[in-house]
A protein has these predicted regions:
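Helix-enriched interaction subdomains in cytosolic or periplasmic regions
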Residues: 1-16, 66
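N-terminal [4Fe-4S]-dependent radical SAM core
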Residues: 10-40, 47-48, 205, 211-262
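Flexible loop/turn segments at secondary-structure boundaries
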Residues: 47-50, 79-82, 115-117, 150-153, ...
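Secondary-structure transition/capping motifs at alpha-helix termini
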Residues: 65-66, 130-138, 182-185, 256, ...
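Short connector loops at secondary-structure junctions
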Residues: 67-88, 150-151, 360-368
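Glycine-rich beta-alpha loop elements in corrinoid/cobalamin-binding modules
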Residues: 77-223
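Radical SAM [4Fe-4S] cluster-binding motif and immediate context
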Residues: 237-338, 342
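Catalytic cores of carbohydrate-active enzymes across secretory and cytosolic contexts
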Residues: 302, 327, 331-334, 339-436
């Protein structure tokens, strides 16, 4: 039985101790003696945010399919635990084994937005890993960055040994195999980085000289090592249908921001908006096979116990098989307590070939604590009320009628319950508890 990195007296003092104990449903456990590479996968934010990230779940599943690799998870501790760890000199640890991150072979950090840059330094500092790549030795893990911010890695380049540019399903196996060959060979850390630099999609900052203009913009960028390419080519998975996908995603112990099954229906976007970073980075558009997605929905619901499905993409309304997929999910799961969340219901509403009327009930917490007394009186009385609320699809008043996430999204999608609309929405903004 594994020993927790934090003592009971610490866990009882901090907020949400379940963030740090691991052992969730579908978390992967392996014997350290049977593996060759230990990889710590980090989302540099609090547990509730990191556990909701699909990219981490995909790589976690892909790595752990290999018998010679054990991929574990690590997130940024909240302020209370951060203070305790510094005071008691407790090194940051992985959730699965509870072992210190500094003892791993790799620390992979996904960099989704610039606001997490300081969290990256927190992760390195708490892990007792030298902040600057040039100061690390053979006793330290290789720190690799991935995610959309790696397309402009220079602001944080000195903290990373290497960056993975692009989608993670293509080149990681080659990197892990190269590490296995290097490990125990007696070669230097630099020699491994030279081998890694030859893998398409990997950028090793040590092997490049960057010069800047007075205004901070990049002036020149040239390799200083014979093994470093002049241009690093981003990685793209052209066949997303056959790419690895987690059929058994880890189920968190506590409520997280995306506490549901997530089906990635496509990558890329046809819109081409110049202000949208994701639209530029994830070109071209690639769709997953609709039959495969149907099977994914069944398997993931069965393996997790989740009661909701979310369809994920940059522009779900542009998925060519959207009507078939949504109709199938509604028909298949309508009597099984499953809600299909979709940001593009208006696609169905605009479909001229849709011959059915769709009635969507949205029962979610609103700004009110429980149903208003006036609504209860209306339900109990025998009077007829013909005066509608100012919003035609809401059942009773919100505390703030000018701003609510659900209401704002429905308005944005153009869902107005007009007579000609095939899709009608009823929004019940109430939190059901023992008082209701």
């Amino acid at each position: 039985m594994r020993k927790l990195a934090l003592d009971d007296d610490i866990l009882l003092e901090i907020e949400k101790p379940a963030r740090y104990i691991g052992g969730e449903v579908n978390a992967v456990m392996k014997n350290v003696e049977d593996i060759d590479v230990r990889f710590a996968m980090c989302f540099p934010d609090v547990y509730e945010i990191g556990m909701s990230h699909l990219g981490i779940q995909i790589l976690y599943d892909m790595f752990n399919r290999r018998e010679d690799v054990w991929c574990e998870r690590v997130y940024s501790p909240w302020h209370d635990l951060d203070k305790v760890m510094r005071e008691q000199k407790i090194p940051l640890f992985a959730l699965e084994s509870q072992d210190p991150i500094k003892d791993f072979d790799f620390l992979g950090i996904t960099i989704q937005f610039e606001m997490c840059y300081t969290n990256i330094l927190q992760i390195l500092d708490l892990s007792q890993i030298p902040l600057h790549a040039k100061d690390r030795t053979l006793d330290d893990p290789f720190v690799i960055g991935g995610g959309p911010c790696t397309y402009n890695p220079e602001p944080i380049a000195e903290f990373f040994d290497l960056f993975y540019i692009g989608e993670g399903e293509t080149a990681y196996d080659e990197l892990l195999d190269a590490y296995k060959e290097w490990k125990g060979s007696g070669k230097s850390r630099r020699e491994f980085l030279e081998r890694a630099a030859q893998i398409e999609g990997l950028y090793v900052p040590l092997f490049y000289d960057a010069e800047y203009n007075e205004d901070g913009t990049l002036k020149s960028f040239t390799p200083n090592n014979e093994y470093a390419p002049a241009t690093v080519k981003k990685q793209i998975v052209m066949d997303v249908t056959d790419a690895p996908y987690p059929m058994k995603p880890v189920v968190p112990f506590i409520k997280v921001t995306q506490d549901r099954v997530v089906l990635e229906i496509q990558r890329g976007c046809i819109r081409g908006c110049r202000f949208c970073q994701a639209g530029m980075l994830y070109r071209p558009v690639r769709e997953r096979n609709v039959e495969r997605l149907k099977q994914y929905a069944h398997d993931m619901l069965q393996n997790t116990g989740h009661e909701e499905i979310s369809l994920s993409s940059l522009s779900s309304s542009d998925y060519s098989e959207l009507k078939e997929l949504v109709t199938y999910l509604i028909d298949e799961f309508k009597n099984k307590g499953i809600d299909v969340f979709l940001e593009s219901l208006n696609r169905l509403n605009r479909d001229k070939n849709l011959h059915k009327n769709v009635l969507a009930f949205i029962n979610v917490p609103g700004w009110v604590g429980d149903p208003r007394e006036d609504l209860q009186e209306r339900l109990k009385s025998k009077k007829s009320f013909d005066t509608p609320l100012e919003v035609p699809f809401i059942t009773h008043w919100l505390h703030n009628m000018t701003h609510d996430q659900v209401l704002d999204m429905l308005k944005y999608l153009g869902m107005g319950n007009r007579p000609e609309d095939k899709v009608k929405v009823i929004f019940v903004p109430c939190y059901l508890d023992g008082r209701d």
